[in-house]
């Protein structure tokens, strides 16, 4: 009986390892769903009293097409297309939907709503795009780059960050 259990250990280990891999792989994909992107955006928007975004498959297709072009070198270069756009990059499974949006929303600390400006030397345009009241549709995509990193793009319709206008 002891021999039988011992001889089954390698296959048990293999099955356990495969199961763990599937769980981790699934959770990684689950952290990048449409709902994950929407929840992260709409939490930030609710904090400033802005209506929630809705998911748009056409905008998401645009985002997917564009990040696919960035996969070769993972350089963040804006598309300058018809939509507002936020880009993020990171390594491994660290760069999830929620993490990308969190990075953009963290710029809130540099935004002064009263003067509608960013603190000197700081960036806050990603944050203002996330909460831009006139942007009502979003589509996002994530791609693994050839260097092993990830690029995330969220695109917004209509685009925000209109000069002279406040986001909310």
From Swiss-Prot:
SMART domains: SCP (SM00198). GO terms for biological process: defense response; sexual reproduction. Induction: Synthesized during pathogen infection or other stress-related responses. CDD domains: CAP_PR-1. InterPro entries: Allrgn_V5/Tpx1_CS, CAP_dom, CAP_sf, CRISP-related. Transmembrane segments: none annotated. Pfam families: CAP. GO terms for cellular component: extracellular space; vacuole. Its main location: other. Residues 38-156 form the SCP domain. It is found in: Vacuole. Residues 1-30 form the signal peptide. SUPFAM superfamilies: PR-1-like. Belongs to the CRISP family. Keywords: Disulfide bond, Pathogenesis-related protein, Plant defense, Signal, Vacuole. Three disulfide bonds are present. It comes from Nicotiana tabacum (Common tobacco). Probably involved in the defense reaction of plants against pathogens. This is Pathogenesis-related protein 1B. The keyword Amino-acid biosynthesis does not apply.
């Amino acid at each position: 009986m002891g021999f039988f259990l011992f001889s089954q250990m390698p296959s048990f280990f293999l099955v356990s390892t495969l199961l763990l891999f599937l769980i981790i792989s699934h959770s990684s994909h689950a952290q990048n769903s449409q709902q994950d992107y929407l929840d992260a955006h709409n939490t930030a928007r609710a904090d400033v009293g802005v209506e929630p975004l809705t998911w748009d498959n056409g905008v998401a297709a645009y985002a997917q097409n564009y990040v696919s072009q960035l996969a070769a070198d993972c350089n963040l270069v804006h598309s300058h297309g018809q939509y507002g756009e936020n880009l993020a990059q990171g390594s491994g499974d660290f760069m999830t939907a929620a993490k990308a949006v969190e990075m953009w929303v963290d710029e809130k600390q540099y935004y002064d709503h009263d003067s509608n400006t960013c603190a000197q030397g700081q960036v806050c345009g990603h944050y203002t795009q996330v909460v831009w009241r006139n942007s009502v549709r979003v589509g996002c995509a994530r791609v693994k780059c050839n260097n092993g990193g990830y690029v995330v793009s969220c695109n917004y319709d209509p685009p925000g960050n209109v000069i002279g206008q406040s986001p909310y």
